[in-house]
């Protein structure tokens, strides 16, 4: 969003609807192609990824230790949940488009479906499975699919539902790629730290990784409740003021 919304806002202000749709098609096609490859590699290489980020479990799996079963279960669950990356990528893009057009309620409500599908999976699917833990992985997959499908009728309403096409060299895509570099660095620092902690926790007692996850959720709670909500609304407004070349109004909005 940090890279995409400002560029789209600029196109929306300076260009006609056709240029905006061409930008969206190029972004969707380019991003979709990359994410599809990453998703396929993640599904096919789930065992390698689990070994990489769960060294302790992998070590026990190699030597017949007590955590060997955890490695196999984690690998299977990662294989089921990894397509969520594909779904959430396009869900986030659709949400950014809707936010740019002032349709904040749709993207704000969308995450509710992930919670509902996970609860439904735990309630109805888990009793049917030999390994009930798999039900939550299925819930994540279905939650991603439902979120993905939910927003697209609203894109059609604003005539921004486009057919993706490859556009690596499209000027808008080039600009987004340039803006993404610092944004990715800022976002990745905390995630890399969490992955390293997960690697180390895999050598500890059962539940250590869960403790880390719960503490991270607790840390993210105020951020998601206030900071994300404010930034979701204010980013399109700031992007419009930047596109209007109105630094005074931009500054007043930031001061607020």
What are the language-model segments listed below?
Residues 1-256:
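Membrane-embedded alpha-helical bundles of multi-pass transporters/translocases
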């Amino acid at each position: 969003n940090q890279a995409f919304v400002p560029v789209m806002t600029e196109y929306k202000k300076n260009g006609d609807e056709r240029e905006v749709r061409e930008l969206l098609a190029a972004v969707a096609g380019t991003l979709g192609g990359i994410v599809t490859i990453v998703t396929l590699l993640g599904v096919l290489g789930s065992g390698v990824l689990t070994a990489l980020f769960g060294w302790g479990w992998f070590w026990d799996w190699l030597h017949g230790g007590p955590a060997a079963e955890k490695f196999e279960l984690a690998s299977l669950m990662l294989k089921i949940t990894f397509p969520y990356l594909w779904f959430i990528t396009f869900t986030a893009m659709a949400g950014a488009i809707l936010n740019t057009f002032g349709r904040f309620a749709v993207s704000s409500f969308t995450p509710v479906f992930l919670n509902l599908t996970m609860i439904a999976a735990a309630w109805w699917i888990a009793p049917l499975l030999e390994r009930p833990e798999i039900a939550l992985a299925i819930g994540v997959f279905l939650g991603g699919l439902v979120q993905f499908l939910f927003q697209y009728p609203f894109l059609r309403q604003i005539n921004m539902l486009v057919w993706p096409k490859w556009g690596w060299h499209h000027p808008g895509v080039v600009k987004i790629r340039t803006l993404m570099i610092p944004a990715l660095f800022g976002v990745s620092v905390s995630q890399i730290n969490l992955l390293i902690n997960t690697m180390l926790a895999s050598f500890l007692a059962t539940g250590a990784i869960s403790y880390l996850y719960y503490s991270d959720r607790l840390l993210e709670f105020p951020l998601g409740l206030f900071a994300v909500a404010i930034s979701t609304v204010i980013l399109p407004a700031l992007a419009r003021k930047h596109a209007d070349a109105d630094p005074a109004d931009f500054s007043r909005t930031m001061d607020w």
